[in-house]
Amino acid sequence: MAESTPKLSLLETRILGTLVEKQRTVPDTYPLSVNALMAGCNQKTSRNPVIETSEAEIVHALDSLKDLGLVREVSGSRVSRFEHLFEKALGVPTQASALLTVLMLRGPQTAGELRLNCERLHRFADISSVEAFLEELAAKEDGALVVELPRLPGSRENRWMHLLSGEPMIEAGAAGRSPSTGMQDIEELRARVSSLEAEVAELRALLLERSRE
């Protein structure tokens, strides 16, 4: 994303992340209708923060994303559907796109968490490959797309966050809320459960979408 491009809102990044996610996990529903997008954005699993947005807000955000060349409307259907132009617009490969998508949908994460949470979008061989793509995104000549955050006390890994919504604000009290090293395995198990819950939610959304057509 060029430096002159306006920074995206939370809803705009949520829409982009949802479009990329659903394209790869439930391709039969892609491109997405406004209703499907709203369901994906308001999803309770695999989302941080969880939001509650309206159809009107989705449509307004889609108009902004279309103006930025990040989304386009697809013709040929009685229901308006939308697809992303994320990888082309940002000039990133599918591996990097998967990482950015999970960061947009789930917030800051360690390389280990990203590898786990990206499994359904792209299966990375190891954490080193995740870190390599993150470092490329952080060093992009036309503007960094991710940043490595300071390591929190008790953590084994640094967290990463995307920069599509601007530079991060480091909270002074963040260190006091960091998980201990012994909690890492529990967090990974929670991530796996969340991934399974997301699959169930997507199957339900697919059935609902087909029932409306």
From Swiss-Prot:
InterPro entries xrefs: DUF480, WH-like_DNA-bd_sf, WH_DNA-bd_sf
One Pfam family per UniProt: DUF480
Disulfides per UniProt: none
SUPFAM superfamilies: Winged helix' DNA-binding domain
Similarity field: Belongs to the UPF0502 family.
Official protein name in the record: UPF0502 protein Daro_2469
Lineage: Bacteria, Pseudomonadati, Pseudomonadota, Betaproteobacteria, Rhodocyclales
